Amino acid sequence: MAFFSSSSSSFPVVFARMEEASSSTGSTGGAMAGIPVIPSTSAALLANTNLEPERIAVLQTQLQEYRQKQMDLIGHFQRAQQELSVQHMHNLYTALQQQQQLQSLQERSGINPMLISQTSEDATSGPAAPLSLANSLTNLLSSSNGNLSNLSVPQTPTKEHHPTLPPQQPSAPTSSRKSDLPRTNSTTISQLTKDRLKNMIANRSKGESNSQSNLMSNVNGHDNSRRLKNSNSQMNVSSPHFEPYRLPTSLANAHNLQQASEFQLRKVNSEPNLKMKIRAKLLSKGNSPVQHVQQTNNSQFSFTHPQLKRSDSETSNMPIDMLPSGSHSNIPHLMLPSPSLPNLAAATGAFQNLNLPIGQDLTAFMAVANLSPFLSLPSLLNKKLELGGMTDEGDRNGFSSSASNSSLASNASLGSHQYQSLLKQQIRDLVLRRKSLVREDPEGEGMAESYNGLFSHAKLQQLTALAMESGFNPKLEPTFSTGLGYDPLMARHECVCSNNSNHVENGERIQRIWSKLTEEGHVAKCERITAKKASLEQLQMVHSQTYTTFFAVSPTACLKIDANALPLKRFLQLPCGGIGIDSDTYFNDASTQIAARLAAGTLIELSSQVAEGRLKNGFACIRPPGHHAEAEQALGFCFFNNVAVTAKVLQAKYPVQCAKIAIIDWDVHHGNGTQLSFDDDPNVLYMSLHRHDNGNFFPGTGSVTEIGKGAGKGFSVNIPFSGGVMKDAEYLAAWRTVVEPVLASFCPDFILVSAGFDACHGHVNALGGYEITPEMFGYMTKCLLSYANGKVVLALEGGYNLDSISAAAEQCVQALIGESDDAGRLCTDSLENLPNQSALETLQKVIAIHKGFWPALHGQEAAINTTEMQWRNVKLQVQMQQQQQLQQQLQQ
């Protein structure tokens, strides 16, 4: 009755008389107990008071509203009672069914059924008859006013495959307890708990007393099936089987439940598991780092797995020529390190000892010497240019003498007009980017000092003069290209089961994307950088030293470290037979370290070249992903946080060029690791568009209230969508009302994108479920090029539908190249549809929280509930008005 509060002095009198009338009428019984009832004589009561007619009318209206609310509450209460009764009846039905199945199984196996009769002494005097759920529900709801169709079924954010109940035969209720159970909530719950406890005690006593009979039945070949059924009966809660993980065919017919993982909250289930992992991590302190899960009690998989052995992972640090030369088929898990650029001095040595026959093709000659990228023109060879700074004087003399062979002279007769455009491009690369031609791995940075310049100053002057003769002006503004980062070695990261169909995150993801880019001709238009492994020092900018050693070198390198300091206490045996750090993320000591270091190192190299101005932008086709990895926690297929490590390296290496870095994360999952890495850094802006479902979607973080801490408050901007399927219209609304205004206010010097494509259409609900088009990712990429002088680098994160992610990546690279207007061209539906109500509520919350940190968000509420086409028209009209006003001011 809060609406009766007023400044009028007559209101307390009315309230007191209403309370007296309410107490005189009493309270209703049953469902109406405890709920006050408005007296029916309210009109007469109001007439006795000295109130004005208008106030009386207001009070009558309020009384009618109160009665309506009262009836609504009563209706909700009755429906809630019905739902609770149905739920309790279903629990009772499940418990009785399990008990009957256990009894029938033991009778068929020859076990004394008296062991179970102790647990069911309260239920029936003999074998329990099968219980029909439909009949029980009918009896339960027969006395209520509601019906079954009014019951609401709670929806879950993931698609679950519930085991179907076996068909039951109808039977007459032979026990009075069956109808008495649902009388009250407390009786039902306590009795059900008692039955479960008795069932557990009986199972334990049965295992102790019948160990001898179990041994005999194992000899007869019946022990495996009995243990499987017993494990099913003991498990009260089992993880449902989800589509991305298939059960082995040998076990698919035996049961339809999946093994309960150590952490029941998995990425493929789209459930938050960070708190559960931290709790389990604390409980398992002091355990051995290599410990196998016993399969006898808590596993439904009966296959065996070989013992975890130390592999020859040290080969990743050996030179290529020291590695065994056997075939890859004999060594399936041997991973070769990614080669850097060819050693130019070694190339000239091979060049010096080469006996070039007369008439050999010049292209093949240069290919042998590994010099074709910068010495493929007869005009350059005729000049007899010396390669200063590359070899000693003897090598240069040998090269000069070899350049005067008749084979080169015959090739020099070719017309120079055929090479004019190629000459310009190569001279441009030599003069403006000569320092990038010799790159060494971070482990050999000490040797890089001898390669500071590929050409001496005198040779550069000769090259410049030659360029001027060919019509190329080196003072003109160069046209930079888009960089691509890719190495096929990253695809070798796989589970030891060697069956990619068991894992949604596999090497085929980057292979399909690279094939798509090659087919569309984008690889030929871009510059592919050399993949490099990240150094341990670079990885330790985000991750701890022990964590880096564990996952970048080998777990065996941490045997002497205190067990409490290890990032992982034990490995898990996955349902596929492989080894994992959790039920989602597999680990292979022969391939994981190399792939993880290559992924981080490739992104660092690509971003460094963009920051230095040698590339205009870039796309890193890398795996494994990284935005879930925290400082000491591998999670969600991620080992090292590639984007976070790269941002730290850019801050340290280029403090002026990359003073402010913006990280845009459009993966459908929140990048918990990236946000934590810069939670208190005001120089790094982290913005994420992701599915949240009020914390019920993996990893459960990224709510609208997570805004950073300390000096970084306001620099973590989360757009967590909940409820409903998001499409282009919802992402466009978020982009124009939140992302672009904040980016414009932040004025970043460099932009990194966690480009996960699992929000693209084609993904199952458990892995995303949104319906974003590939063109939308191209549109967002094109918009980002308007900031930070176009210094934008995309890093592949998630995305598991191969067709969707390859199409989305192709749109992004096409937008980065900038030669086609088709990149990011949205369809009519995307431009003319309004965002749904769930997205509107989310964006309103984000603007309300962050407009105190970003004044540009003020007034953006009006732009939420509009279509993209309407917003563009309004924006165009405003721009035209501003231009007219500017022209008028200039004329005056």
UniProtKB/Swiss-Prot annotation:
GO CC aspect terms: histone deacetylase complex
SUPFAM superfamilies: Arginase/deacetylase
GO molecular function, one term: histone deacetylase activity, hydrolytic mechanism
GO BP terms: epigenetic regulation of gene expression
EC number assigned by the record: 3.5.1.98
Skewed-composition ranges (Polar residues): 171-192, 208-222
Region span, Disordered: 145-225
Region Histone deacetylase: start-end pairs: 481-822
Residue numbers annotated as active site: 628
Entry keyword annotation includes Transcription regulation: yes
InterPro entries in the record: HDAC_PDAC (IPR050284), His_deacetylse (IPR000286), His_deacetylse_dom (IPR023801), His_deacetylse_dom_sf (IPR037138), Ureohydrolase_dom_sf (IPR023696)
Record's catalysed reaction(s): N(6)-acetyl-L-lysyl-[histone] + H2O = L-lysyl-[histone] + acetate
Function: Responsible for the deacetylation of lysine residues on the N-terminal part of the core histones (H2A, H2B, H3 and H4). Histone deacetylation gives a tag for epigenetic repression and plays an important role in transcriptional regulation, cell cycle progression and developmental events. Histone deacetylases act via the formation of large multiprotein complexes.
Record PANTHER family: HISTONE DEACETYLASE, HISTONE DEACETYLASE HDAC1-RELATED
Family: Belongs to the histone deacetylase family. HD type 2 subfamily.
Record's protein name: Histone deacetylase 4
Organism: Caenorhabditis briggsae
Gene assigned in the entry: hda-4
